[in-house]
């Protein structure tokens, strides 16, 4: 893995677009001392304007669609989007629900999917690494 | 006027050193600022205020709004106090004179009683 071009911390903004909080708890688990992704410089930030990565959990509810689009637009370029969980990836058990307009890739372009209900922190960390590589490529102008 | 070092028991004060420190801080601040993101696109959502994904309200919510509960809880006190704040200098001078009279009177009475 070559991550030389992206020579600083990876800042992540997390959006919950209707998740049951299962995935969100696993994301928190990735930040706790057992996994501690902050030692690699990966940290959650409080505003999309500071973020490199948009991390989305949950199938997109009707109320959240415009908000998600606006938040995506507020992330500076180059940016990458990661979906954590089955609901955000496919709709999961809520697939074709009357109240959904998702999954996430119907609203915004997605770079990495991490399936699972919820996915384990190891899977989330692997997804972040894949995303980091994609961001590297974007920064170099490969894609 | 010549700028010199003012020495006191506690330390010293030198305007030249102070200015030098100030300039150093400005240089460091400019350097850190130059390391920031340059990718923001002006005139797009990227430079808009983040308001949890909502459109920011046009009317500004002032910082005094956070004291709403405080003002509400002490409404009677503030209603009473606001009557005194007329904005007229004559009134304020009057309050001053009254307070000075009270202080002098208490000093005199207290002094007499003490004697």
What annotation goes with each model-predicted range?
Chain A
Residues 1-143:
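Iron-sulfur-associated redox domains of electron-transfer enzymes in respiratory
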């Amino acid at each position: 893995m070559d991550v030389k071009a992206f020579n600083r911390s990876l800042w992540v903004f997390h959006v919950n677009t209707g998740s049951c909080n299962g995935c969100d708890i696993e994301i928190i688990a990735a930040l706790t001392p057992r996994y501690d992704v902050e030692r690699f410089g990966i940290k959650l930030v409080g505003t999309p304007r500071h973020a490199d990565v948009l991390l989305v959990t949950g199938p997109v509810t009707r109320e959240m669609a415009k908000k998600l689009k606006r938040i995506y637009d507020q992330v500076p370029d180059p940016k990458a989007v990661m979906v954590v969980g089955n609901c955000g990836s496919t709709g999961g058990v809520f697939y074709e629900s009357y109240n959904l307009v998702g999954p996430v890739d119907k609203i915004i372009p997605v770079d990495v999917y991490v399936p699972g209900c919820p996915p384990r922190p190891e899977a989330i960390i692997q997804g972040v690494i894949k995303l980091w590589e994609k961001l590297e490529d974007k920064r170099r102008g490969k894609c | 006027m010549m700028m010199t070092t003012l020495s006191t028991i506690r330390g010293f004060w030198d305007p030249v050193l102070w200015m030098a420190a100030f300039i150093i801080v400005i240089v460091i601040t400019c350097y850190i600022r130059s390391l920031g993101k340059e990718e923001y696109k002006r005139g797009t959502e990227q430079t808009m205020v983040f308001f949890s994904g909502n459109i920011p309200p046009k009317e500004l919510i002032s910082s005094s709004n956070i004291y709403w509960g405080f003002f509400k809880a002490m409404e009677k006190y503030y209603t009473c106090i606001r009557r005194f704040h007329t904005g007229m200098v004559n009134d304020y001078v009057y309050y001053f004179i009254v307070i000075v009279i009270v202080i002098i009177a208490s000093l005199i009475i207290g002094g007499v009683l003490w004697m």
